[in-house]
């Protein structure tokens, strides 16, 4: 059955307008993006098939062009549209944390750091630099590693902090395995960084580890 023949309150577009985007399933949101189905398959059915094929919405959105375009009902035009949507989402989050803004929402910081690091195939260590009123100065990616480790050097972190005259920092790194639980090495290097920055009177407000689920906060664990 075509979606236009469904009851109005069950159609994805109308449902979004009436109840908001959060009320829609992954398949319904994807169907709105797809707009149309293929022969013998409406947009909702196509969306469900794609989610089953890729395993998750995140896997579909993160697919490389060749893999994406091999899927039934998708092609280069849809890939371009999708990349544009994803980039707009990243820029929205970046604007929310643009230079000069105070950090008033811990959840926004989590979302921003997730967007920057979660799907990286290799480990990346980065930090948010803040002034003495906790306004954002800069987001810096500092160290890049292998699939399971990145070498981190406290001296280079200190140099970066001094260069930008930061008064506080938020550290972050990803675990490409998807498991966000901090390792013993993560805790050890964080202690070394805190000790180094304490010598120049700069505070480490938090250290987030990014994985598949919610980021793990060192501050919430009482480790800072």
Swiss-Prot record:
CDD domains: MPN_DUF2466
Binding-site list for Zn(2+): 173, 175, 186
A biological process from GO: proteolysis
The keyword Transferase appears for this protein: no
InterPro entries: MPN, RadC_JAB, RuvA_2-like, UPF0758, UPF0758_CS, UPF0758_N
Entry-linked PROSITE patterns: MPN, UPF0758
Keywords tagged on the record: Hydrolase, Metal-binding, Metalloprotease, Protease, Zinc
Keyword Zinc: yes
Domain MPN: start-end pairs: 102-224
Short motif JAMM motif, span: 173-186
One Pfam family of this chain: UPF0758_N
GO molecular function: metal ion binding; metallopeptidase activity
Family of the protein in this entry: Belongs to the UPF0758 family.
The name this protein goes by in its record: UPF0758 protein Tola_0183
Lineage: Bacteria, Pseudomonadati, Pseudomonadota, Gammaproteobacteria, Aeromonadales
């Amino acid at each position: 059955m075509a979606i236009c023949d469904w009851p109005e309150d069950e159609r994805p577009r109308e449902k979004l307008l009436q109840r908001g985007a959060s009320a829609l399933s992954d398949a319904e949101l994807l169907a709105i993006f797809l707009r149309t189905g293929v022969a013998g398959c409406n947009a909702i059915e196509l969306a469900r098939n794609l989610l089953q094929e890729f395993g998750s919405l995140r896997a579909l959105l993160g697919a490389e062009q060749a893999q994406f375009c091999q899927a039934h009902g998708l092609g280069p035009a849809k890939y371009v549209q999708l990349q544009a949507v994803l980039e707009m989402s990243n820029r929205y989050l970046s604007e929310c944390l643009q230079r000069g803004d105070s950090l008033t929402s811990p959840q926004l910081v989590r979302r921003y750091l997730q967007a920057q690091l979660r799907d990286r195939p290799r480990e990346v260590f980065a930090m948010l630099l803040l002034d003495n009123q906790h306004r954002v100065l800069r987001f810096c990616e500092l160290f890049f590693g292998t699939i399971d480790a990145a070498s981190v050097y406290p001296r280079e972190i200190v140099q970066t902090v001094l260069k930008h005259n930061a008064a506080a920092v938020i550290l972050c790194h990803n675990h490409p395995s998807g498991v966000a639980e901090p390792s013993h090495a993560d805790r050890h290097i964080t202690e070394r960084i805190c000790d180094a920055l304490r010598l120049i009177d700069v505070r480490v407000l938090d250290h987030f580890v990014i994985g598949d689920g919610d980021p793990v906060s060192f501050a919430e664990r009482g480790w800072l």
